[in-house]
From Swiss-Prot:
GO molecular function, one term: NADP binding
Organism: Geotalea daltonii (strain DSM 22248 / JCM 15807 / FRC-32) (Geobacter daltonii)
Primary gene name: proA
Name of the molecule in the record: Gamma-glutamyl phosphate reductase
Keywords: Amino-acid biosynthesis, Cytoplasm, NADP, Oxidoreductase, Proline biosynthesis
Family annotation (CDD domains): ALDH_F18-19_ProA-GPR (cd07079)
NCBIfam families referenced in this protein's UniProt entry, alphabetically: PRK00197.1, proA
Length: 418
């Protein structure tokens, strides 16, 4: 069989297995996830041995230190993967939940019931922990999942997927409900994206180039998990102590994640006082600032920002900064340059906070809180598959419910349409 034929078979088998997954009880799904967690912990030496092969190959290819760190698995990270499986097992099962019921004038009762999406394709890079994280969420929501990890993690991903599939076999659950595309070539991704007959949705997780490639080549609907160009606007009525604390946390706690702050906007009425203060605080923490002319007027030595800086997701200790005339200009800047991810306003003005919440288009909008709260666990959703920047079908951190859809259910007593 050719690569194209093999991938088509994987997708077709996943479609067949998805029907069995949709029927599986919550208890059966939870037992599976708990056994999977135990299997990962019990086989940590196998996983780390395969991971060592990937790390060695990555070093030979000249992967960056940051990439190698994302790729690396040790005992503590494997335990975290196992704990993640247990956390998903403990979450309420959304499948079969009836979310609304209402009675029509003709006495039929109408409701909406949560059902699995079907077959979910996940395309991701570097992090082999996504193999177990994504599998857990998709399976708990009653879906089949087709995984395609990065070529740099092929041995790690195959080892993890193999251990998870072993537990499915032992419980009599179709192994095809959890499939890993074993072909590291980019052609494997291209063929996967052609399987619209069998795969219901594609969720890509990775860098900007991967997302663009998937969107341009997919025949299947895509839920984009695009870059995080996250903003904070310091309003004229902001408490400076609060603003400084939130900005530092948003930018420096974990600068390499998608909910880290990338652009700071400051109201002109407080620029003369606040810009020098935040410049000093961030410089002490080794943050490189790139400012517009108005910002640099109060922060000598700051590098001039270019148009490209307003679009940039730095993922490091670099921050673009701009002084704006008012709330209108702040909102306009965010809606022009943002990536629909996460934005915050620091203000004591209730009316301004409400306008910001209503008019900013992003998936998570905060008032007087760090952008780092844009996370499924932090928002009370439990584990997440990622943060969607696509308004259809889900927007923002995607938990279990977002891996389902709804259907209408109708109860009658013999009614016919007149």
């Amino acid at each position: 069989m050719t690569v194209a034929e093999k991938i088509r078979k994987i997708a077709a088998d996943a479609r067949a297995a998805s029907l069995a997954m949709a029927r599986l009880s919550s208890a059966a799904k939870n037992e599976l996830l708990l056994r999977m967690a135990e299997a990962l912990e019990n086989n940590a030496p196998l996983i780390t041995a395969e991971n060592a092969r990937d790390l060695e190959a990555g070093q030979q290819k000249g992967l960056s230190a940051a990439m190698l760190d994302r790729l690396m698995l040790d005992e503590s990270r494997i335990k975290a993967m196992a704990d993640g499986l247990r956390e998903v097992a403990a979450l309420p099962d959304p499948v079969g939940e009836v979310t609304h019921m209402w009675k029509r004038p003709n006495e039929i009762t109408v409701g909406k019931m949560r059902i699995p999406l079907g077959v979910i394709g996940i395309i991701y890079e570097s992090r082999p922990n996504v193999t177990s994280d994504a599998a857990a969420l998709c399976l708990k929501a009653g879906n089949a999942v087709v995984l395609r990890g990065g070529s740099e993690a092929i041995h790690s991903n195959l080892a993890i997927a193999g251990l998870l599939q072993d537990q499915m076999r032992k419980l009599g659950i179709p192994v095809a409900a959890l499939s890993l595309i074993p072909f590291p070539e980019r052609a494997g991704v291209t063929e996967m994206l052609k399987q619209e007959e069998f795969i219901d949705v594609i969720i890509p997780r990775g860098g900007e180039s991967l997302i663009r490639f998937v969107v341009e080549h997919s025949k299947i609907p895509v839920i984009k998990h695009y870059k995080g160009v996250c903003h904070i606007f310091v309003d004229a009525t902001a408490d400076f102590g609060m603003a400084e604390k939130i900005i530092i946390n948003s930018k420096t706690q974990r600068p390499g994640v998608c909910n880290a702050l990338e652009t700071l906007l400051i109201h002109k009425d407080v620029a003369e006082t606040f810009v020098p203060r935040i410049h000093e605080a961030l410089s002490t923490l080794k943050v490189e600032l790139r400012g517009d002319e108005a910002f640099r007027q109060f922060a000598p030595g700051v590098k001039a920002a270019t148009e490209e800086d307003w679009y940039a997701e730095y993922l490091e200790l670099i921050l673009a900064a701009r002084v704006v005339d008012d709330l209108d200009e702040a909102i306009a800047h965010i809606n022009k340059y943002g990536s629909l991810h996460t934005e915050a306003i620091i203000t004591s003005d209730y009316a301004n906070s409400q306008r910001f919440l209503r008019e900013v288009n992003s998936s998570v909008v905060l008032v007087n809180a760090s952008t780092r709260f844009s996370d499924g666990n932090q928002l009370g959703l439990g584990a997440e598959i990622g943060i969607s920047t696509t308004k259809l079908h889900s927007f923002g951190p995607m938990g279990l419910e977002d891996l389902t859809t709804t259907k209408f259910i109708v109860y009658g007593e013999g009614q016919i349409r007149q």
